[in-house]
C-alpha cells in the first residue's frame, strides 16, 4: 500500500516576492538560525561566566566567515559548474539585468557545512586571540547552537529541492520535481528526505550537548574545556557519514555524482577525520588527563 498522504513536497524556494525583491525560505531559515543561536549562546556564555558582550561581538564575524567558507568550499569542489559559459550569471534589479559571477549566487543554493565549520573555527581562533579568551571555553558554548542551527537550516534544502537522497517508497518519501532530478532518476518521483534525517539527527545531537552542559553547570558532571566540542564532532559526524551515503549530489573526490563512481565522497572523508579528531580529544582529556592545547594562544600552550 502506497502512503501518498505522507509524501513531502516543497512549495518552492520563495516565501514571497515584492516587486524586484523576493524573500527565500533558505535566507529566512538562516536568519532564524542566527537569532536562535545568538540567544542560546549568550545564555550559555553567561552561565559559564564569560563576558556578556562576547557572543554579540563574535557573532557577526562568525556568521560572515561561515557563509563565505561554506560557499568557497562548495564552489571549490564544483568548479566545473562555475567556469566557461557558466562563469557569468545575472540578477534582475529594477528590471535591469546586472551581470555577476555565478559563484556569488549563494541565494540559489550551493553551500557546504564543512566549509562553514572550517572558516567559522578559524574566525573563532582569531577572535579569541584578539580578545584574549580561551578558545575551548568559547567554542563549548557555541556548539549546541551550531547543532540546533543546522537542524533548522537543513530545511532550506527541502524548499530548494536539493540535497535529497536515493529513490525510496518509504511512507516519509520526498517528491522531487522532474527538473531537479539526476538524469538517471528522471522517471522516479520519490526520494529519501535526507534533509529531514539530518535535521532530526542534529536535534538529537543538540539534546545531548545541552543536557550535558546543564548537568555540568549544576556541578553534577565535570566537563573539562573542549569536551562538548569533541562530542559534537563525534556525534554530528557519525550521522553525517551515514546520511551522506544516501545523497545523490555529493561532493566527490575523483568521481562523479550521484554515486561518486571511481572516487570518494568528500563529506564522508571529512566526517571520518572529525570523528577521529573528536575521539583523540576525548582520549587526551579523560585518559591522559591533559588539557587540550589552545589554538588561539600564540604558542599553543594549555590554559
Curated annotation (Swiss-Prot):
One of its GO terms (biological process) is lipoprotein biosynthetic process. Its main location: membrane. It is a multi-pass membrane protein. It is an enzyme of class 2 (transferase). InterPro entries: Lgt. Its EC number is 2.5.1.145. It comes from the Bacteria. Keywords: Cell inner membrane, Cell membrane, Membrane, Transferase, Transmembrane, Transmembrane helix. It is found in: Cell inner membrane. GO terms for molecular function: phosphatidylglycerol-prolipoprotein diacylglyceryl transferase activity. GO terms for cellular component: plasma membrane. Coiled coil: none annotated. A 1,2-diacyl-sn-glycero-3-phospho-(1'-sn-glycerol) binds at residue 154. The keyword Oxidoreductase does not apply. The keyword Cell inner membrane applies. Pathway: Protein modification; lipoprotein biosynthesis (diacylglyceryl transfer). The chain crosses the membrane at residues 18-38, 58-78, 106-126, 133-153, 193-213, 223-243, 266-286. PANTHER family: PHOSPHATIDYLGLYCEROL--PROLIPOPROTEIN DIACYLGLYCERYL TRANSFERASE (PTHR30589:SF0), PROLIPOPROTEIN DIACYLGLYCERYL TRANSFERASE (PTHR30589). HAMAP family: Lgt. Belongs to the Lgt family. Catalyzes the transfer of the diacylglyceryl group from phosphatidylglycerol to the sulfhydryl group of the N-terminal cysteine of a prolipoprotein, the first step in the formation of mature lipoproteins. This is Phosphatidylglycerol--prolipoprotein diacylglyceryl transferase. It comes from Prochlorococcus marinus (strain NATL2A).
Amino acid at each position: 500500500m502506497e502512503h501518498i498522504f505522507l509524501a513531502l513536497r516543497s512549495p518552492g524556494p520563495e516565501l514571497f516576492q515584492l516587486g524586484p525583491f523576493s524573500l527565500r525560505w533558505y535566507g529566512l531559515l538562516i536568519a532564524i538560525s542566527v537569532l536562535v543561536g545568538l540567544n542560546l549562546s549568550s545564555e550559555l556564555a553567561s552561565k559559564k561566566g564569560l563576558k556578556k558582550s562576547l557572543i554579540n561581538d563574535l557573532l557577526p564575524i562568525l556568521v560572515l566567515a561561515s557563509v563565505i567558507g561554506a560557499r568557497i568550499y562548495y564552489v571549490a569542489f564544483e568548479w566545473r559548474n562555475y567556469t566557461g559559459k557558466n562563469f557569468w550569471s545575472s540578477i534582475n534589479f529594477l528590471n535591469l539585468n546586472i551581470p555577476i559571477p555565478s559563484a556569488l549566487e549563494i541565494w540559489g543554493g550551493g553551500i557546504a557545512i564543512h566549509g562553514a565549520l572550517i572558516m567559522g573555527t578559524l574566525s573563532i581562533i582569531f577572535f579569541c586571540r584578539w580578545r584574549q579568551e580561551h578558545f575551548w571555553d568559547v567554542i563549548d558554548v557555541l556548539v549546541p547552537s551550531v547543532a540546533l542551527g543546522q537542524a533548522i537550516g537543513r530545511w532550506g534544502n527541502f524548499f530548494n529541492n536539493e540535497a535529497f537522497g536515493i529513490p525510496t517508497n518509504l511512507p516519509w518519501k520526498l517528491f522531487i520535481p522532474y527538473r531537479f532530478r539526476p538524469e538517471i532518476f528522471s522517471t522516479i518521483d520519490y526520494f529519501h528526505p535526507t534533509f529531514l534525517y539530518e535535521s532530526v539527527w542534529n536535534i538529537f545531537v543538540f539534546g545531548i550537548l545541552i543536557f550535558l552542559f546543564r548537568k555540568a553547570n549544576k556541578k553534577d558532571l565535570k566537563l573539562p574545556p573542549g569536551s562538548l566540542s569533541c562530542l559534537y564532532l563525534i556525534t554530528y559526524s557519525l550521522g553525517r557519514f551515514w546520511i551522506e551515503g544516501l545523497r545523490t549530489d555529493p561532493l566527490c573526490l575523483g568521481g562523479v555524482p550521484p554515486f561518486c563512481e571511481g572516487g570518494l565522497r568528500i563529506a564522508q572523508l571529512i566526517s571520518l577525520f572529525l570523528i577521529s579528531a573528536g575521539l583523540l580529544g576525548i582520549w587526551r582529556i579523560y585518559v591522559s588527563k591533559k588539557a587540550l592545547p589552545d589554538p588561539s594562544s600564540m604558542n599553543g600552550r594549555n590554559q
